[in-house]
Curated annotation (Swiss-Prot):
It comes from the Bacteria. HAMAP family: NhaP2. It comes from Pseudomonas fluorescens (strain Pf0-1). This is K(+)/H(+) antiporter NhaP2. The keyword Transcription does not apply. One of its GO terms (cellular component) is plasma membrane.
Length: 580
C-alpha cells in the first residue's frame, strides 16, 4: 500500500463519514432512523453504486466489534442503576429465555422457507435472535417512554448479546463438525460466558473508577483513559472466553453510577465517539453487502422478517415477562414491537463466512435484509406506536444547558442554566420569594448582554438567563420551579383532575371524595396502596383503577410514590384541575 492509496482511503473515508452526517439531518424530516440512512450511504457507495469494492470480512468484523465495544461502554455510562429496580430481572429474562424462543421460532421458519436442515435454520435464528444496543440506544433517546419500558429495552439490548453469540458459535461448531444434537455441557459454557463477563466487567469498572479518581491528568485524557480501559476489559474477557459485550457494558455501568472525575468531559467525548462508531460500523456494513444479491431472496426473507416481528418476538416477550405482573399489556405490546435488529446480527453473520460454512453468504444476506426491514418497519413506526399504546409520559422540564463544577475529585456539583419565558411562574417575582430546593444557589443572572448581581430584591423578567448551582437530584424540583405554567393539556390529561400527596392516609382520601372504604387498613397511605395495586416496582405513569376512579403515579420520591394523580368519571367531579 503506497502513499497515494493511503491518501485515497483517507479522502474516501472522510467523504463517506461527512456525507453520512449531513444526510442524517433528513432523519427527523422523513421519519427514517438515522442508522438506515447511514446504511444507505454505505450501500450507495458500494459495488452497485459508487463502485467501491469491499469484501474484507475480517476487517468488517474488527470494525464492528470495536464500534460495539465503544457503543456499549457509552450506553453503560448513561444507564442509571436506579432503573434496575424496575427492569433488571425482566430484562435478563428477555435476554436469555426471550432470545432462545426467538431463535427457535425464527430458525424453524428459516429452515422451511429456505429448504435448510434444522441446525442451519437455527443458526439463522441465532444470528438475528438478539436486539441491538446501537439501534436501541439511538432510537429510544428522547422519545419520552416510561421508565419500565425504556430500562427493560436498554438493559435487554446490553445483555442479550452473550446468548446470541453463544448460540451462533455453538451452532457453527456443530455444522462444521457434523454434529446433530445438543449436549448439556453447552449450558456450562453459557454460564461461563455470563459469569466471566460479569466478574471482569464489574471488577474492571471498579479498577478504572479508582484509577481515574486517583491520578492527575490533563482533562482531555480522562475520556481516552476510560475508552482504553473499556477496550482492555472487552478484549481480556473475550480472551478468557467470556462475553466481552456484557463486560464492557457493565464496566461503563460501574463508572457511570459513581462519582468520577471529569464526568461531563468523559460523557461528552464518549457521545462523539459512540456516534463515530455507529457511523463507521454501518458504513462498513453497508459497503459489505451487494444489493443485487438481496433481490433473489427478497420475498422469503421478507416473510421471515415479518414472522419474527409479528410472531416470534411477541411470543418470546409474552413468555419472558410472564412472571412479572407489573407489566401491562400495552407495555408488553410495545416491547414486542421494539425488537430492533442492527449491527450485531450482521456481525454475527460474518462468523459463518470466516468459518467457511456452506450457505454462509445466504446467512449474511438474510441477516442484512432482516436488519433493514426491522429498522425501516419497527424503527420508523416507533414514535407512532408509543403514542398508540400510551407508554409515554410527560417530559420533565430540563435546563437549556448544564456543566460540571470540578470543586473536588469526586464533586458532583453542576451549573444549570434556565431561560425564563413569558409563561414561567416566577416572572415578576423577587428572588427572595422563590422556594429554592435545599442545597441549591442562584449563582448569576444574565439580562440581555448584562451580568447582574442577584440579590433578594432582584425581580425576574422575561428572557432572563438564570444560572443555578446544584446536584442532579435537584433537577426535578428546579424544573418545576422554572417550568411553564400548567396548561389544561398533556400534563393534566395524563395525570388527572387532581394531584394528591403519596403519604396521604388512604382512609382520609376515601372519606374526602366519598369513596367506599370497607376493608381498608386505616394506617395505609395512598402511595403504598397504589404500589400494591401496581404489583411491582412503581414508576411515573403507572395507572390503576379503584372504585371506578383512575389513579396515576405522578411523582416518584426514590422508591416511594411521592404524588398520585386522580381522575374521576366524566362529569362526576367538576372543578378546576390541579397539577403540582
Amino acid at each position: 500500500m503506497n502513499a497515494t492509496t493511503i491518501n485515497s482511503l483517507f479522502l474516501i473515508g472522510a467523504l463517506l463519514v461527512g456525507a453520512s452526517i449531513l444526510v442524517s439531518s433528513l432523519s427527523s424530516r422523513l421519519g427514517i432512523p438515522i442508522l438506515v440512512i447511514i446504511l444507505a450511504v454505505g450501500m450507495s457507495a458500494g459495488v452497485d453504486g459508487g463502485g467501491i469494492i469491499f469484501d474484507n470480512y475480517p476487517t468488517a468484523y474488527l470494525v464492528g466489534n470495536l464500534a460495539l465495544a465503544v457503543i456499549l461502554l457509552d450506553g453503560g455510562l448513561r444507564t442509571r442503576v436506579s432503573s434496575f429496580r424496575v427492569a433488571l430481572w425482566p430484562a435478563l429474562s428477555l435476554a436469555t429465555v426471550g432470545v432462545l424462543i426467538t431463535t427457535g421460532l425464527t430458525g424453524m421458519a428459516a429452515a422451511w422457507l429456505f429448504d435448510l436442515n434444522l441446525i442451519q435454520g437455527l443458526l439463522i435464528g441465532a444470528i438475528v435472535g438478539s436486539t441491538d444496543a446501537a439501534a436501541v440506544f439511538s432510537l429510544l433517546g428522547g422519545k419520552g417512554l416510561n421508565e419500565r419500558v425504556t430500562a427493560s429495552l436498554e438493559i435487554e439490548s446490553g445483555s442479550n448479546d452473550p446468548m446470541a453469540v453463544f448460540l451462533t458459535v455453538t451452532l457453527i461448531d456443530m455444522l462444521a463438525s457434523g454434529q446433530t444434537g445438543l449436549h448439556w455441557s453447552l449450558l456450562t459454557h453459557l454460564i461461563r460466558e455470563f459469569g466471566i463477563g460479569g466478574v471482569i466487567g464489574l471488577g474492571g469498572g471498579w479498577l478504572m473508577l479508582q484509577l481515574v479518581n486517583r491520578i492527575n491528568l490533563a482533562t482531555g485524557l480522562y475520556p481516552i483513559l476510560v475508552i482504553a480501559g473499556g477496550l482492555v476489559v472487552f478484549a481480556l474477557t473475550n480472551a478468557l472466553h467470556g462475553s466481552g459485550f456484557l463486560a464492557v457494558y457493565l464496566c461503563g455501568l460501574v463508572i457511570g453510577n459513581r462519582p468520577v472525575r471529569s464526568r461531563h468531559g468523559i460523557l461528552h467525548m464518549l457521545d462523539g465517539m459512540a456516534w463515530l462508531a455507529q457511523i463507521g460500523m454501518f458504513l462498513v456494513l453497508g459497503l459489505l453487502v451487494t444489493p443485487h444479491d438481496l433481490l433473489p431472496i427478497a420475498l422469503p426473507a421478507l416473510g421471515l422478517a415479518l414472522w419474527m416481528i409479528l410472531f416470534a418476538r411477541p411470543l418470546s416477550v409474552l413468555v419472558g415477562l410472564l412472571p412479572f405482573k407489573a407489566f401491562h399489556g400495552r407495555e408488553k405490546a410495545f416491547i414486542s414491537w421494539v425488537g430492533l435488529r442492527g449491527a450485531v446480527p450482521i456481525i454475527l453473520a460474518v462468523f459463518p463466512l470466516m468459518a467457511g460454512l456452506p450457505n454462509a453468504q445466504l446467512y449474511f444476506n438474510l441477516a442484512f435484509f432482516i436488519v433493514l426491514v426491522s429498522l425501516l418497519v419497527q424503527g420508523t413506526s416507533l414514535p407512532w406506536v408509543a403514542k398508540l399504546l400510551k407508554v409515554t409520559v410527560p417530559p420533565e422540564p430540563a435546563p437549556i444547558s448544564r456543566a460540571a463544577l470540578e470543586v473536588h475529585v469526586t464533586s458532583e456539583w453542576e451549573l444549570f442554566v434556565y431561560k425564563l419565558g413569558a409563561e414561567k411562574w416566577c416572572i415578576g417575582s423577587p428572588l427572595r420569594e422563590l422556594k429554592m430546593p435545599e442545597g441549591t444557589r442562584i449563582a448569576a443572572l444574565f439580562r440581555g448582554q448584562q451580568l447582574l448581581h442577584p440579590s433578594g430584591s432582584t425581580v425576574l423578567e422575561v428572557d432572563d438567563l438564570l444560572c443555578v448551582i446544584g446536584h442532579e437530584h435537584n433537577l426535578p424540583a428546579l424544573g418545576k420551579l422554572f417550568s411553564q405554567a400548567p396548561q389544561r393539556g398533556l400534563d393534566l390529561r395524563f395525570f388527572g383532575d387532581f394531584v394528591l400527596e403519596g403519604d396521604a392516609q388512604l382512609k382520609a382520601v376515601a372519606a374526602l371524595y366519598g369513596l367506599p372504604a370497607e376493608g381498608i387498613d386505616p394506617d395505609m397511605t395512598l402511595g403504598h396502596f397504589i404500589a400494591q395495586k401496581v404489583g411491582g416496582a412503581p414508576i411515573v405513569g403507572d395507572q390503576v383503577e379503584w372504585n371506578n376512579t383512575h389513579w396515576t403515579v405522578a411523582v416518584m420520591d426514590g422508591n416511594k410514590i411521592g404524588k398520585v394523580g386522580v381522575r374521576f368519571p366524566e362529569g362526576s367531579r367538576p372543578g378546576p384541575g390541579l397539577f403540582l
